[in-house]
A protein has these predicted regions:
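Alpha/beta catalytic barrel-like cores
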Residues: 1-137, 148-158
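Short mixed-charge
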Residues: 149-174
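A short acidic (Asp/Glu
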Residues: 94-98, 137-143, 190-195
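Conserved, mostly hydrophobic/aromatic
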Residues: 181
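Catalytic or ion-translocation cores adjacent to nucleophile or general acid/base/metal-coordination motifs
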Residues: 171-173, 191-194, 198-212
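Short secondary-structure boundary/capping segments
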Residues: 101-102, 143-147, 196-199
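Short helix-terminating capping/connector loops at secondary-structure junctions
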Residues: 76-80, 118-124, 167-176, 203-206
Length: 212
């Protein structure tokens, strides 16, 4: 897997509004367009999609594919380019905790959309960023929740003797996701090696990114 070199972190404080924006405050379709320009004009190979502390467009992948089809046919989202969710930390942001669950549920949906678009199994979103990370358990809960509940429910039926959810709705992919801890406080930056060692103890991963 190719590691991205340049990430756009969504609308930093600018001297003036960008040329594509219809409002001073970027939101909705302006954020989708910003992501496209980050990829196509600025040469970024990764866009952070910030779900922390604000409303976010859950249909960003569909809008990118629909409005910029030719670009994303040539630049495969999930292979050449990445779209990475920054999710709320439930331990630190109680009022937004359930937004985390909402965003995890979108990952199999956009996988299905991508399969229709590219004709092969490519996950356009397969990583999430956990801000204010402090311990291995916080990272692991997201990893296990996605694997055991978001994807795991496909093997269950809504009632005894009925078909499984996968037979009813279709398979849920990808089977697992990567969770990127963002260590923001010096104390936890210094503990990052130990925290990651504990988190990875029961996992076989080919890559693990860490943000400081």
């Amino acid at each position: 897997m190719r590691i991205p070199k340049v990430m756009s972190t969504q609308h930093p404080d600018n001297v003036a509004s960008p040329f594509f924006s219809t409002n001073v405050v970027l939101s909705g379709d302006d954020e989708v367009l910003e992501a496209f320009y980050a990829y196509s004009h600025l040469g970024c190979d990764e866009q952070m999609w910030d779900c922390e502390g604000k409303e976010v467009d859950a249909y960003v992948v569909k809008k990118l594919f629909t409005k910029h089809e030719e670009f994303f046919r040539e630049n495969v989202l999930g292979r050449d380019l990445r779209l990475t969710l920054r999710v709320p930390n439930p331990e630190e942001e109680k009022a937004e905790a359930k937004i985390l669950l909402e965003q995890l549920e979108t990952i199999p949906r956009v996988f299905d959309l991508s399969k229709l678009f590219y004709g092969e199994d490519i996950a356009p979103i397969f990583e999430v960023i956990l801000p204010m990370a402090k311990e291995a358990d916080s990272i692991d809960r997201i990893y296990k929740y996605y694997m055991n509940y978001v994807v795991g429910k496909q093997n269950k039926a809504t009632k005894e003797g009925d078909i499984t959810i996968a037979e009813w709705i279709g398979e849920f992919k990808p089977a697992t996701i990567n969770v990127i801890p963002l260590f923001e406080d010096l104390e936890y930056m210094l503990k990052a090696p130990q925290i990651l060692k504990e988190y990875l103890l029961d996992k076989e991963v080919t890559e693990q990114r860490v943000f400081l």
